[in-house]
Amino acid sequence: MNILITGIHGFVGSNLIMALCEHHTLYGLDIISPEKKGVVRTFLWEDIETTSFPIQRLPHFDAIIHLAGKAHDTKNQSAAQVYFDINTGLTRRIFDFFLESAARKFIFFSSVKAAADSVVGDILRENVIPTPVGPYGESKIAAEDYIKEHFVLSDTFSVNKGKMFSFKEEIVRYSDKQVYILRPCMIHGPGNKGNLNLLYNVVKKGIPWPLGDFENKRSFTSIDNLCYVVEGLLTKDVASGIYHMGDDEALSTNELIALMCEAMGKKPHIWKMNRKMMEGCAGLGTLLHLPLNTERLRKLTENYVVSNEKIKSALGIDRMPVCAADGIRKTIKSFEE
């Protein structure tokens, strides 16, 4: 297949290229266009504008994978509009291009944060009513909404001011196309510099984890499992729709730290400080504007479990190829290199 991938120089893009380049012909679309191993050519965003680069002069693409976007800023220093300009604006541009092109498949990388900032109940599934919090999740759901306004997903309908759109012409026009909205939870793997790397640096210094009394569960996404799912969406006849993505097993922060220490050959230092006492300290931190406050404590200790049953059923598999623990071990060992 000829595949166009946006955001190829990022963490996920680089790993996808390594996973796909052996059996597919890959093209890039990014804000920079240096040569990249495994990529035939990288186009710039202005190249897909028909006014400057007619679509007839571009290669024939069988599929488009849209990765480009602004990641969640954990320091909250980015202006809200930047998220919408990039996460929503670029999605509109590339999806419009997809609809006009001969490409048959479109994979959009959204996020579970487009669905919910916190999980209500035991597990987050695709049928949840989206309630994003903050510009990252809000810009992602806005991008999803744009896609649904212009393409009928098999398990969703689009709504505008309480009225359903009439899609008869579009259904006929785009009946040969398939569109997938992927909502992965936290992705990790070699080359990842996100939150997992921050926790790794704390553990590596031997700093004790004082929140061992909180037994939370969180879902993660191994980059190997993610690449496996993308390959499946590209090569199998999977129905268009929204799919959550995560490893089979959810891990507690205590288990995560233990796995990190195991990979580093260190003994874990997990302190089970009294839960009520830690909640009181966090409350005081809120009043005094200290690093550990009530909101940060909630984020560090809450459950965030994501179901992957729908995507596994769509691909016809019972389990992901990599278990959560093995994926974490591989990531941590890459930090050590």
What do the PLM-derived regions correspond to, one by one?
Residues 192-198, 212-234, 240-241:
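Substrate-positioning beta->alpha
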Residues 48-86, 97:
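NAD(P)H-binding glycine-rich loop region in Rossmannoid oxidoreductase-like domains
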Residues 93-135, 154:
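Conserved Rossmann-fold NAD(P)-dependent oxidoreductase catalytic core, especially the SDR/UDP-sugar
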Residues 3-22:
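N-terminal Rossmann NAD(P)H-binding glycine-rich loop of SDR-like oxidoreductase domains
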Residues 134-154, 165-180:
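Active-site Tyr-X1-5-Lys
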Residues 236-292, 324, 329-332, 336:
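Mid/C-terminal beta-alpha module of Rossmann-like enzyme folds, strongest
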Residues 177-197:
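Flexible, glycine-rich beta-alpha linker
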Residues 223, 258, 281-318:
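Conserved C-terminal active-site "lid" loop/helix of NAD(P)H-dependent oxidoreductases
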